[in-house]
């Protein structure tokens, strides 16, 4: 059921018994201080929609005891088993069955124990970034040109980025920056998304703890999520400490991934059992 929360956002309950968490994984990690949350960025032109393909897929692994955060990006063209749909690009799982099937796909293919998620579209992402005052990012000239091309296609009143190098991006500009993929590779696109998220974390760390609740409520008003405001606020104390942030991409170099045409589409294929 989708419920409009008291903070102004959408809370969607998921069937936690149908998320593909194996008994072995549940027993192994169920009592640790590590929490894994799936983040999805959906590809939609409807500003108020949270449906469609998951154009961005990230797992945030939070170790409260060690104050460690891992940002694990899963490339959208990864070919995986999707329950009821055979082997396909992982980006399709969200379109087929929403967050539940997308989480189940991650758990079953990568031996995870994810039970919570947050989904945002790129329009809402722009609003979320603006809440924190934008981000400062070092961009290349190629990125600047493509950013302006995409932005102009989306919005005739788009504010162009006038120079490359270290620049301040508005929410709309940073959201478009996160979507660039034609000029290089999906790996480079994931790197851009991680840069934006790391900037947002740094921004949040410089906010007074007394404002955390208002910040979380404002941000969650822009998402569809299985979590409540108190659940998200339970991670806030980590912001006042030194956080270690590690970033990873799946498939990585050690996965021996091979890119190529499979069933008429370009995908990453690799041995998930290895």
Please identify what each model-predicted range represents.
Residues 46-49, 88-96, 111-116, 164, ...:
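Second-shell loop/turn segments in exported
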Residues 29, 50, 130-211:
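Flexible, polar/acidic helix-loop-strand segments at domain edges
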Residues 30-36, 42, 49-53, 83, ...:
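Solvent-exposed, acidic/flexible segments
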Residues 54-56, 87, 91, 99-107, ...:
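Extracytoplasmic/secreted envelope proteins and their assembly/folding machinery
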Residues 32-35, 52-57, 66-74, 85, ...:
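Extracytoplasmic
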Residues 96-158, 226-232:
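Amphipathic, coiled-coil-like alpha-helical scaffolding segments used for oligomerization/assembly
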